[in-house]
């Protein structure tokens, strides 16, 4: 028997694809949401054939926030779990020269994800059950010259998830904040990432599935990142501002 569905936003991303396999393996029906969702037809067919679960495709644009309420209303079934894997790394130097890419990064990493989860939060609250998962970033723990546009948006998203968790804690709805650290994905392709600090998409998916099952609040996919960010955040601003980070 197929379990209640999991809704994956940003379903084309490597992490979302790994999550689709992880939840389908557990017998969960899947709702895959992305722009140009029809291009995920081969993924849909493979998941259904491989795991024997129902998989549906849903057109979704994170930046078209005026459509988010209708998107949720038109779902064939309200999911039990919703995971937002929407994000855009962008190029920091381009964002410093031109506000257009900067705003796109901010909207893709904060406004869009927060908007759709806010809509779902209201539906989950009315039902008094469900789990919302937001994939944020350790980059949001402290602003750094090398990625402060992206980091600032993730900082906002992390704060949003914290507040949402506080609001819904006694309403039967759980909120999970995921801080992956480096992940080997298409988004980071070409970057020199330290292997010891870099997770694979399947590793992130397993950590998220476990966090949902155990009702964890905030997770670092690799625990070493908790230590690293504790150290980074403890450096006095008078010293930190002169560091090359």
Predicted regions and their residues:
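Conserved glycine-rich cofactor-binding loop
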Residues: 12-13
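Rossmann-fold cofactor-recognition segment
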Residues: 48-66
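Conserved mid-core segment of classical short-chain dehydrogenase/reductases
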Residues: 87-103, 146
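Active-site helix of classical SDR
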Residues: 117, 153
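Residue(s) in the substrate-gating loop at a strand-loop-helix junction
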Residues: 137
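Active-site loop immediately N-terminal to the catalytic Tyr-X3-Lys motif
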Residues: 142-148
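C-terminal helical subdomain
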Residues: 177, 193-230
């Amino acid at each position: 028997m197929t379990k209640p569905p999991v809704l994956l936003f940003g379903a084309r991303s490597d992490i979302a694809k790994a999550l689709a396999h992880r939840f389908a393996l557990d017998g969960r029906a899947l709702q895959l949401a992305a722009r140009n969702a029809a291009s995920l037809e081969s993924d849909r067919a493979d998941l259904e054939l491989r795991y024997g679960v129902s998989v549906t495709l849903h057109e979704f644009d994170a930046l078209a926030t005026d459509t988010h309420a209708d998107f949720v209303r038109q779902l064939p079934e309200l999911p039990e779990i919703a995971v937002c894997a929407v994000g855009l790394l962008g190029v920091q130097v381009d964002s410093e020269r031109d506000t257009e890419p900067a705003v796109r990064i901010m909207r893709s990493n904060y406004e869009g994800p927060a908007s759709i989860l806010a809509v779902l939060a209201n539906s989950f609250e009315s039902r008094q059950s469900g789990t919302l998962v937001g994939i944020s970033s350790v980059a949001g723990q402290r602003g750094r010259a090398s990625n402060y546009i992206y980091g600032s948006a993730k900082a906002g998203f992390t704060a949003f998830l914290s507040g949402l968790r506080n609001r819904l804690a006694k309403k039967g709805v759980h909120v999970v904040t995921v801080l992956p650290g480096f992940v080997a994905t298409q988004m980071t392709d070409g970057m020199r990432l330290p292997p010891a600090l870099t997770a694979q998409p399947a590793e992130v998916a397993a950590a998220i599935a476990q966090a949902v099952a155990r009702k964890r609040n905030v997770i670092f996919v690799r625990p070493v990142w908790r230590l690293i960010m504790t150290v980074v955040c403890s450096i006095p601003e008078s010293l930190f501002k002169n560091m090359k980070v």
